[in-house]
């Protein structure tokens, strides 16, 4: 499985990139079925807040359906965790399709 981690309007450090890759590759259910995983972090300025809001979008591509989930938080890894939780719930669609 290819894992692509990128950022829009923000820098993704090597530490964050390696943590994301390790967590996605550790999921045995999807590792064999998914051909490509794309993780995009997007920084968004929020009016009245000195911090930037982060959005993490995870897209899993396979021969069948494309499964996508999004998470929002002020921290990259928290946003990734929220998106990964939503992805776990949606991965049933991918599992059922392969059967």
Please identify what each model-predicted range represents.
Residues 1-99:
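N-terminal, polar/charged subdomain of small-to-medium soluble alpha/beta proteins
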